[in-house]
Design a protein with these regions (language model features):
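Short active-site oxyanion
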Residues: 1, 29-33, 66-69, 113-117
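Short, well-structured N-terminal submotif of metal-dependent ribonuclease cores
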Residues: 1-35, 47-62
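Histidine- and aromatic-rich ligand-binding microenvironments
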Residues: 5-6, 35-36, 100-101, 122, ...
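A generic structural signal for short hydrophobic patches within well-formed alpha-helices
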Residues: 10-11, 40, 78, 125-126
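Residues that scaffold the ATP/ADP-binding catalytic core of kinase and kinase-like folds
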Residues: 13-14, 46, 81, 128
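Active-site-proximal, substrate-binding regions of enzyme catalytic domains
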Residues: 42-83, 87-88
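Active-site neighborhoods of divalent-metal-dependent phosphate/nucleic-acid chemistry enzymes
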Residues: 70-117
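Acidic, PIN/NYN-like endoribonuclease modules and their adjacent C-terminal/linker elements
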Residues: 108-134
Length: 134
């Protein structure tokens, strides 16, 4: 199975939570694992806001690169991500969730291009056929 790991899943993995243990097992058993480059930026921002030492941030980013193929934003991904974002935004309005971020669109768009399942606990992805819920 091909998977794409989103920010939510990485945060849980680095916390060492029960969900994080599940993420680790999913990554280890996957045929291929991906994460968009935007997820590295998103996690880096989160950790710097939380005043996590830079050395630890870099270690986590390196671990992500070691565990997954990092997918760049490409001319092929941009339209896929934009369409995915619009779908997520419409569903969020319907379900009365906060608006998704463009990062969410990049995650879903990249997963669709790779024909991969998104590993997440983010409510924006709940119920989608592309989701492995943690």
């Amino acid at each position: 199975m091909k998977i794409l790991v989103d920010s939510y899943a990485w945060v849980e993995l680095f916390l060492g939570s029960g969900k994080g243990g599940r993420v680790r097992g999913i990554i280890e058993s996957a045929d291929e694992a991906f994460t968009p480059d935007s997820v590295l930026a998103e996690l880096s921002r989160k950790y710097f806001r939380e005043r996590v030492p830079e050395r630890l941030v870099k270690e986590r980013l390196s671990a992500m690169q070691g565990a997954c193929h990092v997918l760049p934003i490409t001319p092929e991904l941009a339209p896929s991500a934009s369409k995915a974002y619009l779908e997520l935004a419409e569903e969020a309005r319907r379900r009365r969730l906060r608006s998704p971020s463009l990062f969410d669109g990049l995650v879903l768009g990249a997963a669709r291009l790779q024909e991969a399942k998104v590993v997440t606990g983010d409510p924006h992805f709940q119920g989608l056929p592309e989701t492995i819920w943690i």
